[in-house]
């Protein structure tokens, strides 16, 4: 009897000495081609910018077969959703909110004043974005956790005005899923829009008038994950509003050695593959025995996985693989080059190995810190950079919703003390009017 084919493709980097750039080229990476859908999304954004809610509702009816009575969800529907929420789900959401607030409440930066001399100060003042739109996707699953992960840091930053946008659902009379509504109400958000996709992003950016004549006020910033069309719309609208990031398909990398339990490793790889057929699951290990055992576990666990078809497509896609390396040192180089959204460390000395990681959206240390914990109740944020963007970007946090403003205050004497240098530099850059703006202050 022949052995079943391996679930995951293998990439053997043992004996290879590659630069970070060469590693990135050798490692599996899927992702979606946002550029390819821009021609489709651009007219949607333009139409919503011109016709507002009417266009957004038309697109929703055309794409999804759902046309809500209005964009804004009535307060009574939010109250009813929270009242009807399953008690266990409500309790779990409350725990998630408490733990997420505990972590994020300490993240807010304080104003800092630097004195450069008598009468010369520069203060960095942190000011929250005034109005933020938080997108919560529909699709393969319901994501009340995304409501929490977006709303909590925005509230901790002091954002005054929040609106949650989520796709209307035919089975809920054109409202977003009631669990989404309940999560918003639980967090004290009273403005929820029943609109999804690229048209939701455009409506958040440009605003409009609802079917009852009420204003749909545009936002200053849009955050939250979504599909490729949502991502494309965020790209097109980012000159008008700020965005958090262009989210791609989710990904997990696991750095594991011979001490790791293949049952845990396989379960964690499957857990992220459950999100999307484009999700990436990557194991980086120096242990061929662990690679074999994990592949066998994957084959076995897939038999009882609820979303087997979706998970199998993700695991067998070009974005997923087992990467064999010489040792843990080589594995660290690989995962730093890969810059995963989620990185688990399951090695003999996991905390020490984790301290060497410089590029990851979030790091989960040891066998009892699975990514699923971070998705819900670790207290960390699960809106994280994908597609290698962890090399230069961070996950959603309180800082996402804050703007640093430099406040410069000099006295006459302080300006006079540095005026000669200002005039010299302005002259060197052939900007004489800059120097004159200083010199004329001391003419009389």
Swiss-Prot record:
It comes from the Bacteria. One of its GO terms (cellular component) is peptidoglycan-based cell wall. Binds 1 zinc ion per subunit. NAD(+) binds at residues 135, 199, 227. GO terms for molecular function: histidinol dehydrogenase activity; NAD binding; zinc ion binding. Pfam families: Histidinol_dh (PF00815). Its cofactor is Zn(2+). The keyword Oxidoreductase applies. It catalyses: L-histidinol + 2 NAD(+) + H2O = L-histidine + 2 NADH + 3 H(+). The keyword Metal-binding applies. The active site is at residues 341-342. Its EC number is 1.1.1.23. Homodimer. Belongs to the histidinol dehydrogenase family. Catalyzes the sequential NAD-dependent oxidations of L-histidinol to L-histidinaldehyde and then to L-histidine. This is Histidinol dehydrogenase. It comes from Mycobacterium tuberculosis (strain ATCC 25618 / H37Rv).
């Amino acid at each position: 009897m022949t052995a079943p084919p391996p679930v995951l493709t293998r990439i053997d980097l043992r004996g290879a000495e590659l630069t970070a750039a060469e590693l990135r080229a050798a490692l599996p990476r899927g992702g979606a081609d946002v550029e390819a859908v821009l021609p489709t999304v651009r007219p949607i954004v333009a139409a919503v910018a011109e016709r507002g809610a009417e266009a957004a509702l038309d697109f929703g009816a055309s794409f999804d077969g759902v046309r809500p009575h209005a964009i804004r969800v009535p307060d009574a529907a939010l109250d009813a959703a929270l009242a009807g929420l399953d008690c266990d789900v409500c309790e779990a959401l409350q725990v998630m909110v408490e733990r997420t607030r505990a972590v994020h409440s300490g993240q807010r930066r304080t104003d800092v004043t630097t004195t450069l001399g008598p009468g010369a100060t520069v203060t960095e003042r942190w000011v929250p974005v005034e109005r933020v739109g938080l997108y919560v996707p529909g699709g393969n699953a319901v994501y009340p956790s995304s409501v929490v992960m977006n709303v909590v840091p925005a509230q901790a930053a002091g954002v005054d005005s929040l609106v949650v946008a989520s796709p209307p659902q035919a089975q809920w009379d054109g409202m977003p899923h009631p669990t989404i509504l309940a999560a918003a109400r639980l967090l004290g958000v009273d403005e929820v829009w029943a609109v999804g996709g690229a048209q939701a992003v455009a409506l958040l950016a440009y605003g409009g008038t609802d079917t009852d004549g009420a204003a749909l006020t545009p936002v200053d910033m849009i955050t939250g994950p979504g599909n490729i069309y949502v991502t494309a719309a965020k790209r097109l609208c980012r000159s008008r509003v700020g965005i958090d990031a262009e989210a791609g398909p989710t990904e997990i990398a696991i750095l594991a050695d011979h001490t790791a339990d293949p049952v845990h490793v396989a379960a964690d790889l499957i857990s992220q593959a459950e999100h999307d057929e484009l999700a990436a699951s990557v194991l980086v290990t120096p242990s061929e025995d662990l690679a074999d055992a994990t592949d066998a576990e994957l084959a076995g666990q897939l038999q009882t996985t609820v979303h087997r078809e979706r998970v199998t497509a993700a695991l067998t896609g070009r974005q997923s693989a087992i990467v064999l390396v010489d040792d843990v040192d080589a594995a660290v180089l690989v995962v730093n080059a890969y810059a995963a959204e989620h990185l688990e460390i399951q090695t003999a000395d996991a905390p020490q190995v984790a301290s060497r990681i410089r590029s990851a959206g979030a790091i989960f240390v040891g066998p009892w810190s699975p990514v699923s914990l971070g998705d819900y109740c670790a207290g960390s944020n699960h809106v994280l950079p994908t597609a290698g963007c962890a090399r230069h970007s961070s996950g959603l946090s309180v800082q996402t919703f804050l703007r640093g403003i430099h406040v410069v205050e000099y006295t006459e004497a302080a300006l006079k003390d540095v005026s000669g240098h200002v005039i010299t530099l302005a002259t060197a850059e052939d900007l004489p009017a800059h120097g004159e703006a200083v010199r004329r202050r001391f003419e009389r």
